[in-house]
């Protein structure tokens, strides 16, 4: 069930977020905890622990929002969450509410997160989707786009490790 997987990803991402505190702030004296330069220095010095947590945060939090966005789209209609350039036979079955066999399901391609959040935004803005969670996601559209960009920058280019105080 994608809903459960989404919340497992959220749980992992949040655990790692709180782990960054352990990786950095536990080693700071009380007077250093307000000094951003010292905090960022400790994060860099601890290196691997902070970076591991940081990567898990970006990957798993983005994964949660991607799965939940697609779930919201699918709840309205499965076609909102799939690539419309797919197999026309499968699309025909979906349009006519004909059950898909396992081979059809295997060949169904879901949209990328960036496209999914764009679709969700249009559906909410046009009153087609009125779900409170969908509205909340759309009200944070720029943040979700930035999160997706951050995750893609990390995964595909291995760049953009945020300083601890930016996180």
Predicted feature residues:
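Charged alpha-helical initiation segments
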Residues: 1-59, 63, 72
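Intrinsic-disorder-associated interaction segments
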Residues: 3, 62, 106-109, 113, ...
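Surface-exposed polar/charged interaction patches
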Residues: 16, 20, 97, 123-126, ...
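Hydrophobic/aromatic-lined pockets within catalytic cores
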Residues: 18, 22, 69, 73, ...
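Charge-enriched, short contiguous segments at helix-coil
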Residues: 127-167
């Amino acid at each position: 069930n994608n809903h459960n997987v989404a919340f497992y990803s959220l749980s992992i991402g949040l655990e790692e977020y709180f782990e960054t505190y352990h990786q950095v702030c536990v080693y700071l004296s009380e007077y250093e905890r307000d000094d951003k330069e010292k905090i960022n220095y400790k994060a860099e010095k601890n290196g691997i622990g902070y970076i591991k947590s940081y990567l898990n945060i970006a990957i798993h939090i983005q994964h949660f929002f991607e799965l939940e966005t697609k779930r919201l789209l699918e709840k309205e209609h499965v076609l909102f969450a799939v690539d419309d350039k797919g197999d026309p036979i499968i699309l025909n079955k979906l349009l006519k509410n004909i059950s898909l066999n396992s081979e059809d399901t295997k060949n169904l391609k879901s949209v990328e997160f960036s496209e999914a959040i764009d679709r969700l935004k249009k559906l909410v803005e046009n009153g087609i989707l009125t779900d409170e969670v969908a509205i909340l996601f759309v009200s944070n559209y720029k943040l979700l786009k930035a999160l997706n960009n951050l995750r893609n920058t990390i995964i595909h280019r291995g760049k953009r490790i945020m300083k601890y105080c930016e996180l």
